[in-house]
Amino acid sequence: MVDFPGYNLSGAVASFLFILLTMKQSEDFRVIGPAHPILAGVGEDALLTCQLLPKRTTMHVEVRWYRSEPSTPVFVHRDGVEVTEMQMEEYRGWVEWIENGIAKGNVALKIHNIQPSDNGQYWCHFQDGNYCGETSLLLKVAGLGSAPSIHMEGPGESGVQLVCTARGWFPEPQVYWEDIRGEKLLAVSEHRIQDKDGLFYAEATLVVRNASAESVSCLVHNPVLTEEKGSVISLPEKLQTELASLKVNGPSQPILVRVGEDIQLTCYLSPKANAQSMEVRWDRSHRYPAVHVYMDGDHVAGEQMAEYRGRTVLVSDAIDEGRLTLQILSARPSDDGQYRCLFEKDDVYQEASLDLKVVSLGSSPLITVEGQEDGEMQPMCSSDGWFPQPHVPWRDMEGKTIPSSSQALTQGSHGLFHVQTLLRVTNISAVDVTCSISIPFLGEEKIATFSLSESRMTFLWKTLLVWGLLLAVAVGLPRKRS
């Protein structure tokens, strides 16, 4: 018999034979699950099942249900009791072990009140002593949402714009338009977003060139359930409504506001009309979620974007004349950009665009000397708290721009910019230079002046002082030794 250093071959053979004799063979221990995906509707209960073969009791076998990691299970059943220590938090109190069938190796787990987050793959894992087996199951969650709503914008130069909206769908639905003959119409834009519950909101926009004799349908299709919901709009009928002949106006110039100030977004109907029975909506680029929605005399909080909650106030003193102002409290850099103001009644709306420019003048620039490179100093100009991104040139006393050696603009967590710029001092004959930080469209700037000549003299005197001290030490040491 051949022996390897530190290893006994006869002992290894004995261990191998022991394992063969004690290990359960895979052909005698199998786990099977459903042959097809399990379909469950949002809000319903789902039953996940699997079976141990050959059929035998699973009372003293560990059964573990998990999603992706066995260490964080959906449910664990061991020695006849539920084990909850490592259970995923989102399944606590929402899963139920079904006892029926465990004597024959059948196990089942019921998940109550199915949500979109439950969609996907699950694993059923058996552990009995030294052997384990598992199988996977696919749970398909589906939900039919609301029937689509079709909103029509009053006629414009390019035709009539239709916006189809639907919410509460899962998975992501398909939205398409059809004419009166059932032929597909091409949407000009589509938008989908998942809400906090995982359900989809869908929006599709269509432009109809010939609105004189058209009925148009919008259909929303669930690809899992192969079911759909639809709505039809008659354009000639809608063109006779009140809002089709009105216009919405807003400020002709951009609205300028500084960070921390309150924003005023005003829009009004022309000619004047009472808007008390209308829906008025301010949004960014899509109808949902919105900045603020007024409907039936009240604010609709459920449609509001999270970043505007608690920050909007509607001024409706002149609502009977069709004039409304939305106040957004304490402007932030993220508020900067385009807004839309929409008046809607009987699914017909008119809109105006508003351009909001949020600005912040930062701190006065500070110039420090960062040392030297190739025998020259490196003046650095820095400042905090700017928005939008500022313009940061160095200039000589004649106003001519001097190229910087580097410039860094970083945006902080609140959206404000911090700027740092280093001056290229090589071959500069200027005595003084300025660091100017400005926001071009605001027409304001902050300036700091730096004297190169004084800094060179200060730098020279510091250098001479250091050399003088070194020389004194060098001369004094030999005398002390003597």
Swiss-Prot record:
What residues bear carbohydrate chains? Answer: N210, N427
Please tell me whether the keyword Transmembrane helix is annotated for this protein.
yes
Per the record, GO CC terms?
Answer: external side of plasma membrane; plasma membrane
Its BP terms in the Gene Ontology are: negative regulation of T cell receptor signaling pathway; positive regulation of interleukin-2 production; positive regulation of T cell proliferation; regulation of cytokine production; T cell receptor signaling pathway
Q: Which SUPFAM superfamilies match?
A: Immunoglobulin
- Kindly list the residue ranges recorded as spanning the membrane: 7-23
Q: Which domain of life is it from?
A: Eukaryota
Its biological function?
Answer: Negative regulator of T-cell proliferation.
Q: Which disease is it linked to?
A: Sarcoidosis 2: An idiopathic, systemic, inflammatory disease characterized by the formation of immune granulomas in involved organs. Granulomas predominantly invade the lungs and the lymphatic system, but also skin, liver, spleen, eyes and other organs may be involved.
Q: Which PANTHER family match?
A: BUTYROPHILIN, BUTYROPHILIN-LIKE PROTEIN 2
Q: What is this protein called?
A: Butyrophilin-like protein 2
Gene encoding it?
Answer: BTNL2
